Amino acid sequence: AVPAYNTTPGRDKYHPRHRDNGYILTFDGLRVYIAGDTEDIPEMKDLKDIDIAFLPVNQPYTMTVPQAAKAAKMFSPKILYPYHYGDTKIGELKDALKGSGIDVRIRELQ
């Protein structure tokens, strides 16, 4: 398990440290990181060889677009799927990660 928590002052009430987890699943040779509800926490620097990552982008509960970009750059997954983004201008995440080598895939809700 990987910790999942808020670091921004005032938001720790949503996801306090030492309560929630994210997970790395390995199957068919792929390492998939599902972050859970979290922000760009320092523990993400320790993630290695992540093929696919799922990161939450939704205020006020999880990451801003800049936080999600920072988080992704910490461990450089091959593919990134943002989730929980609701009305967030999620296209800005693609722009923020342009040139990083991270393939940002956005699934539009229908």
Regions found by a protein language model. Give the residues of each.
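Active-site metal-binding motif and surrounding structural segment of the metallo-beta-lactamase
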Residues: 48-54
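Active-site environment of divalent metal-dependent phosphoester hydrolases
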Residues: 7-9, 39-43, 60-65, 82-91
